[in-house]
Amino acid sequence: MTTRTIDNIRNFSIVAHIDHGKSTLADRLIQTTGTVALRDMSEQMLDSMDIEKERGITIKAQTVRLEYRAEDGKDYILNLMDTPGHVDFAYEVSRSLAACEGSLLVVDASQGVEAQTLANVYQALDANHEIVPVLNKVDLPAAEPDRVKEQIEEVIGLDASEAVPISAKTGLNIEAVLEAIVKRLPAPKGDREAPLKALLVDSWYDVYLGVVVLVRIIDGVLKKGMTIRMMGADAAYGVDRIGVFRPKMADIGELGPGEVGFFTGSIKEVADTRVGDTITEDKRQTTQMLAGFKEVQAVVFCGLFPVDAADFESLRGAMGKLRLNDASFSYEMETSAALGFGFRCGFLGLLHLEIIQERLEREFNLDLISTAPSVVYRLLMRDGELKELHNPADMPDPMKIETVEEPWIRATILTPDEYLGGVLKLCQDRRGIQIDLNYVGKRAMVVYDLPLNEVVFDFYDRLKSISKGYASFDYHVSDYREGDLVKMSILVNAEPVDALSMLVHRTRAESRGRAMCEKLKDLIPRHLFQIPVQAAIGGKIIARETIRALSKDVTAKCYGGDISRKRKLLDKQKEGKKRMRQFGRVEIPQEAFIAALKMDD
């Protein structure tokens, strides 16, 4: 490709809230530009995992190269970067945006602007993108394009007078979107003669090709046979294959400035290719590195254990394979007295946790139990040491701790007016601090600071049920704050169960402990001796329930006769039960763990 045609390249991404029709629009663009023959088209072309299609969400960012002849008679190359919409995958969004110059903002004309639309738009604005608003689903009877245009102008502050009204489902007005991309989005800039400088956008593992690296060329040219250097990881590799995606891989000779494509080489591990790294030619290196991405930090941790201990090795292998494709997922070995061997895993959020667990169960046929999700706490010890606590069971002696800090989030909630009271009460109950409350048309936009610990359990489910599914929620971790947090242990028959221990705020410890004990009382089967179920903070018991003993009638075989005979048998039974209570083991069934962790308040 010559320098002349860098003006005919457009790199763009599509940002939208879940279900506003982003993947469907991508399908239509692919179809309209004739990139894929009609007989090969399928729904959600760019969502390659089954789980993405089933849940209707995009998890991994994908790219596709479209070739389009515009009304001005010129041929354009459009590189579409499909991005996920969900907050857990915000880092996938940020790296797709960094490789583009513009974005299409897709808003559902019947739903209007949602919380995650906002979050992603702000990311696009941070990346200095030109943004073209697109109103989707205008063919629905409930569509109100004019109201939504006003909303876009009010909430986001974008000029929506030239928003393109489309229906991605029926294919209405898709040509207008392509024209808007060509006319309104800027062309990339780059110098073909300069040393190679490229941004590593993504990498994944392919069984046949090894590690495949997705790059956006800024300056210079990437050719076959070249030796390249990753500047951040400081490693050099040979380039075997270069190509682009027309959803399927297609080989080409070279990638020039402004282009997006992939290469494969002698790279063994995905971990060697850090997203956001700068790639340059080994012989002729560029002097300055690109501003990379932030390292992704795991926010939520939980233990994953195989139901059958024999599956431990398969679980280890499965995790290694998933780690190849998802560098944001981290894990380390841990053992639990109650659950045996397993792993402590770190995730970006709750959806990420669910998806990893579902992929492990589905793609590798494993049966898993997960322990209660927890967040990372910071402990300042009396001797001045700073510790990070990932697992509540490892909490050191409270006497040695000076302060405990927990992560807080800044949450933006958009909800219809009539559910506002319930939403505010929910946030208040979760120790929230109200920051802001605005009205956008008939909807309230509430901004709250909340402790992440309170959100991790079931905040999202509760929010959806309070608002009948209409409220949308988006958050980012803002900072760490000191809190009066205590470790609550659950004791069954005076034995602590490590998998059920958690850190809670002192004010909520009692209600949480009581609820947990009541739940376990119903779930643990009765034994021949009485079992106390207790919640404790340190040595102090804060809640207790008792599982009654099954009683065996030992005097059944005595007909009448002397009372002392019966008493002797009853005393003998009492003796036995006492001994049993001392040495008897209480089996806690699997369901009890799972149900106890899904606890409602």
Curated annotation (Swiss-Prot):
Residues reported to bind GTP: D19, H20, G21, K22, S23, T24, N136, K137, V138, D139
- What CDD domains has UniProt attached to this entry? EF4_II (cd03699), EF4_III (cd16260), LepA (cd01890), lepA_C (cd03709)
Q: Which GO terms describe its cellular component?
A: plasma membrane
Q: Which keywords does the record carry?
A: Cell inner membrane, Cell membrane, GTP-binding, Hydrolase, Membrane, Nucleotide-binding, Protein biosynthesis
Subcellular localization, as worded in the UniProt entry: Cell inner membrane
Q: Which GO terms describe its molecular function?
A: GTP binding; GTPase activity; guanosine tetraphosphate binding; ribosome binding; translation elongation factor activity
As for membrane topology, the entry says:
Peripheral membrane protein
- Leading EC class: hydrolase
Question: Which superkingdom does the taxonomy of this entry point to?
Answer: Bacteria
Matching entries from InterPro entries are given as: EF-4 (IPR006297), EFG_III/V (IPR035647), EFG_V-like (IPR000640), EFTu-like_2 (IPR004161), G_TR_CS (IPR031157), LepA_C_sf (IPR038363), LepA_CTD (IPR013842), LepA_IV (IPR035654)
EC number(s) from the headed UniProt entry: 3.6.5.n1
Please name the GO terms of the biological process aspect recorded for this protein, alphabetically.
positive regulation of translation
Does this UniProt record's set of keywords contain Zinc?
no
Query: What reaction gets catalysed by this protein?
Result: GTP + H2O = GDP + phosphate + H(+)
Q: Where is the tr-type G domain?
A: 7-189
NCBIfam families, A to Z = lepA (TIGR01393), small_GTP (TIGR00231)
Similarity remark: Belongs to the TRAFAC class translation factor GTPase superfamily. Classic translation factor GTPase family. LepA subfamily.
Per the entry, what this protein does is: Required for accurate and efficient protein synthesis under certain stress conditions. May act as a fidelity factor of the translation reaction, by catalyzing a one-codon backward translocation of tRNAs on improperly translocated ribosomes. Back-translocation proceeds from a post-translocation (POST) complex to a pre-translocation (PRE) complex, thus giving elongation factor G a second chance to translocate the tRNAs correctly. Binds to ribosomes in a GTP-dependent manner.
Please report the name of this protein according to its UniProt entry.
Elongation factor 4
Origin organism is Methylorubrum extorquens (strain CM4 / NCIMB 13688)
This protein's encoding gene = lepA
